[in-house]
Amino acid sequence: MTVGQALERAEELRPGSRISLRTRQQWLRELDGLLRLRFFARCDTKEFDHAGADRAWAEGLQDQDRLLVPEPFDGLYVHYLCARTDAALGETDRYAGEQAQYNGICAELAGWLRRSYPVRRAAQWRW
């Protein structure tokens, strides 16, 4: 999924949310940095080294920049953006639902990474 696709899908679900584009881009950067640290850094592969909003941020995040998480788990970006939007606007019930969906996809992603890639030496999975 690209930055533009994630932002567009989240905007469809939360139209007119009053959250600036720059803030939503910052959320994507923070999320990719967190996911890289918690999940992808433990995998002994270089496949994901150049993807992610955290890596593209220095050059200015563009709509066509590829996000870190591959299909079919990339739907987590939309749930994350919606959850952050709901939290920022005080929509706690909507936030809880979106966050639960995000957490479920994260758990599936962690399992897939453990099964698909060897663990780097001196790294431990804690999920």
Which residues make up each language-model segment?
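Short conserved catalytic/interaction loops centered on acidic-Pro-aromatic/His motifs
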Residues: 90-100
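Conserved short "hinge" loops at termini or chain/domain junctions
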Residues: 1-66, 104-127
